[in-house]
């Protein structure tokens, strides 16, 4: 699928706006290109590559023009561009994803523990939303998006997207972290390793323990 060139600026705007409330530490130098050092001490972020060895490829990624494979259980694919793909994002407080959705495909309820998200729809029709905290009575904020529409998901809030159209959908999203993380709710609760006690989940979700065990068997294999 070819992404409409006229809507590319919206994706760029999403990235620029993600700078405003970046949650990662601000850099204290021009750049700090990430480098993996198994012999080093763990730090909150990444070690810096010697600036004299930094080159253009440390700030480059290619491939967001290519659709992701949505032939899976949820009918979506997230192509992530964070510090793991672009080491030069280290300390920059931003990252980017492309999300492809098959018709009726979804990005299931999940959270990003370390970053807010701003999403721009490029093709198709999405129903998107997030749920506020217990303190706010778990209110649902949701909208149907069309090409060019933008929606924000606050940091830590459970949110989702589902393709409600008859054609594939494409969205881009900027996140206010070099590695925002993702916690998919169903996989985390029912697919933890080792499993959470079924009796605990049965009472928490008001389900029969046998149903919980069935869900654990399903999500534990993903």
Swiss-Prot record:
Disulfide bonds join 32-48. The keyword Manganese applies. The keyword Metal-binding applies. SMART domains: Cupin_1. Gene3D superfamilies: Jelly Rolls. It is found in: Secreted, Extracellular space, Apoplast. Its main location: secreted. One of its GO terms (cellular component) is apoplast. One of its GO terms (molecular function) is manganese ion binding. It holds the Pfam family Cupin_1. Mn(2+) binds at residues 110, 112, 117, 159. PANTHER family: GERMIN-LIKE PROTEIN SUBFAMILY 3 MEMBER 3. Belongs to the germin family. Oligomer (believed to be a pentamer but probably hexamer). May play a role in plant defense. Probably has no oxalate oxidase activity even if the active site is conserved. This is Germin-like protein subfamily 1 member 18. It comes from Arabidopsis thaliana. The lineage of its organism: Eukaryota, Viridiplantae, Streptophyta, Embryophyta, Tracheophyta.
């Amino acid at each position: 699928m070819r992404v409409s060139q006229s809507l590319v600026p919206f994706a760029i705007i999403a990235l620029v706006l993600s700078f405003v409330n970046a949650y990662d530490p601000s850099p204290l130098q021009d750049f700090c290109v990430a480098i993996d050092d198994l012999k080093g001490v763990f730090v909150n972020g990444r070690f810096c590559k010697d600036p004299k060895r930094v080159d253009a490829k440390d700030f480059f990624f290619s491939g967001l023009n290519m659709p992701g494979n949505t032939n899976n259980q949820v009918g979506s694919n997230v192509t992530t561009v964070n510090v793991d793909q672009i080491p030069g994002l280290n300390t920059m407080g931003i990252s980017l994803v492309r999300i492809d959705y098959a018709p009726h495909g979804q990005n299931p309820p999940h959270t990003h523990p370390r970053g807010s998200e701003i999403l721009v729809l490029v093709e198709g029709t999405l129903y998107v939303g997030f749920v506020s905290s217990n303190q706010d009575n778990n209110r649902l904020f949701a909208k149907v998006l069309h090409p060019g529409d933008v929606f924000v998901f606050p940091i830590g809030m459970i949110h989702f997207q589902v393709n409600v159209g008859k054609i594939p959908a494409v969205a881009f999203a900027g996140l206010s972290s070099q590695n925002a993380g993702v916690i998919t709710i169903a996989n985390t609760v029912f697919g933890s390793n080792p499993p959470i006690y079924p009796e605990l989940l049965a009472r928490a979700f008001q389900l029969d323990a046998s149903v919980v065990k069935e869900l654990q068997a399903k999500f534990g294999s993903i």
